Each structure stands twice: as structure tokens, then as C-alpha cells.
Amino acid sequence: TELEFAWAFIDKCSLALTQGELSAEEAAMAKWWTTEFQKRAIDECLQLHGGYGYMNEYPISRLWRDGRVQSIYGGTTEIMKEIVGRNLGL
């Protein structure tokens, strides 16, 4: 459901990019949606591992750290929301 939506939207954006038609707003929406989805999904996985999820010996710890930074570099989620909001005239 959410994952399928993310894949479909990323496919649409990839096609638009290769055709030179990807707008900044669409790119911002894609980054915003997929990074927030990634954070929610990896948080649930971390929860399943309990305290082990925070130990560096387990891959889930690295995945959580890597997933968290996705919403920061390249423009924070808040900046992506600003870009989308400008397109909506807000």
C-alpha cells in the first residue's frame, strides 16, 4: 500500500526526470514522502528488535541511522514542505 505508492511515485518522477519534465515541487514531494515513509518503516523494525536495535553490532542500528539522515541531507523535510507549499500558493 504505502510502499506501492512510493514505488509508483518514484517511477513517475524518474520518468519525468529522464524526459526533462521533473519539477522542483514533484522532486520535493518524492523526497518528503519517501524519507518519512522510510523513517516510519525502520522505526517499526527497530521496535521489533528492542534494545538490540540500538547496538552497533546489529545491522538494524546502522539502517536506522542511515534512514534518519535521509530526511536531513539534500534538504530537510521542513524545506521540502516549504517548496511544496509555495507551489500551492501557501
Regions found by a protein language model. Give the residues of each.
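Alpha-helical interface subdomain recognition
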Residues: 1-90
